[in-house]
Swiss-Prot record, chains A, B:
It is found in: Cytoplasm. This is Probable manganese-dependent inorganic pyrophosphatase. The lineage of its organism: Bacteria, Bacillati, Bacillota, Bacilli, Lactobacillales. Its main location: cytoplasm. Disulfide bonds: none annotated. Its EC number is 3.6.1.1.
């Protein structure tokens, strides 16, 4: 069987990288020949998790078709979030927990999606269904992915299935998930030694909303005032990125992981900003607005933006 | 929990109707409130199977949004094969074995697809994963769906998983699958008492191929010469349907289920016919051509047509 690459989305987070590693292990057990790779460097949080469970970061690729004819996707399906030459390879498998958008294939494929908090929760179910034993390190990296995506089970995307998976995986991994989880999340909140350009690209995704190219970035912090001291520099970096990449709107969600509140910074045309304000029923003041309780891009940001841009 | 409708594609076959019934039973066991319906009348083969296992044909609906806010799809995902107001309801679940095309959602959903011969094979796996006991009549209708889609496991779409499912389901249903299967398939081959207009619409699907609207219909027979005596009337009906519905090409695949060969009739522009000939590397003679061994629209017709229309 020809080798296939498995990867998550661009600007990978712990789910994108952790679930790729877990899926590759599972598929290889089932007779496939796969390698988990990544579409970017691991962030600090992911590095902490990889290190904790004894993994090295997956190799970073820029294109896939120079290596393989077929790939498997985790934690994404939208082509603009995938490898740059996704149209030149065949997608044979997808495991994801996002909406399906602009994902078209010529042939039938394996597709497994569920509206749960993390792709690793689906992966945990797949291991159980296939009755493949989960090694301790794989359990640890899947646990880390779920903690990351659900902000320690506090995000509104969290389902009972995520909670079950966390308890089961923490048991196999041999860690106290609350204690470990908070350490891991905090490892991802050190923004002091990173430039604004880097911070707005660490966990950023593009969405085509009714013809508009909308960028939504998110950073996790434990000290919101510290982050907002750099507001002008953030806005400048977002403005420059928008001009360079052609974004119609750029939104940065700065989330305090300790109290699950966020502050949003927004740059874009007056028309885009009006749509943003409509989406969240909130007025921007000097490009900034509080979004109390908003922590999930997928569940609390993209749907209202989609509705506002389509109205 | 609000009621949801479950249905397969337009011009329903035994998979579309049988798997909808089986999925509704499974989901209701899991706590959902669902009803299996159909987007058209059951054909003769499906009626035979429904009758054999004690089911009445599901209620036929033309629209969904007048009844429910949310639906579950089986055996299709492409919007033009679905209910006419699919854009007005939320799709919460899909179980399918086709390519994914033009299927976009605003929110995450349950999506389960695999490149196997029949949707009921995936459904059988889902019952097993959820450890829900399959009643005898549900096993019978799922068995019928797999026999129908795989032409008694002889279609090139057939996988080992389909074969396993057939053996397991036949055992639960208490039938000899070969004997029953041939009787069921033959029940669908009586074309004598149907008009050409009806026959070209019984099992027909539309595909958008690079901007062209291509219709592919299939009928199963046991006596190919009998069917070809009506060739001129078939061509006339296909031509009229094309003008009425705006098809750029209409292809009718007449398949002899006993020897797994087909004869194709084709109407359309010279340009479309040239693409057809390129797709199958075969010359049409008086709008007709033999396609030896071709029995699967999904695996042996749509992919070569897609390639030819996109070249």
């Amino acid at each position: 069987m020809a080798k296939e690459l498995i990867f998550g989305h661009q600007n990978p987070d712990t789910d994108a990288i952790g679930t790729a590693i877990a899926y590759s292990y599972l598929q290889n057990k089932l007779g496939y020949d796969t390698e988990a790779v990544a579409l970017g460097e691991a962030n600090d949080e992911t590095k902490y998790a990889l290190n904790k469970f004894g993994f090295t970061a997956p190799r970073v690729i820029k294109t896939a078709s120079n290596e393989v004819d077929a790939v498997m996707l985790v934690d994404h399906n939208e082509p603009q979030q995938s490898v740059s030459d996704i149209d030149k390879v065949k997608v044979t498998h997808v495991v994801d927990h996002h909406r399906i958008m602009n994902f078209n294939t010529a042939d039938p494929l394996y597709y497994r999606a569920a509206p749960v908090g993390c792709t690793s929760t689906i992966m945990w179910q797949m291991y159980n269904e296939k009755e493949i034993e989960i090694p301790q390190d794989i359990a640890g990296i899947m646990l880390s992915a779920i903690i990351s995506d659900t902000l320690l089970l506090k995000s509104p995307t969290t389902t009972d299935q995520d909670k079950e998976a966390v308890v089961s995986l923490a048991n196999i991994a041999g860690v106290d998930y609350k204690e470990y989880g908070l350490k891991m999340l905090k490892a991802g909140t050190n923004i002091a030694d990173k430039s604004e350009e880097d911070l707005i690209d660490l966990d950023a995704k593009s969405f085509e909303l009714n013809g508009s190219n909308v960028r939504v970035a998110q950073i996790n912090v434990v000290d919101l005032p510290e982050a907002l001291e750099r507001k002008d520099a953030f806005l400048k970096a977002m403005d420059e990125a928008s001009k360079r990449e052609g974004y119609d709107m750029f939104m940065l969600l700065i989330t305090n992981i300790l109290d699950s509140d966020s502050e949003a910074l927004v740059v874009g045309s007056d028309e885009s900003k009006a749509k943003f304000e409509k989406a969240f029923n909130a007025k921007l003041s000097d490009s900034e607005v509080k979004l109390p309780g908003v922590v999930s891009r997928k569940k609390q940001v993209v749907p209202p933006l989609t509705n506002a841009f389509e109205a």
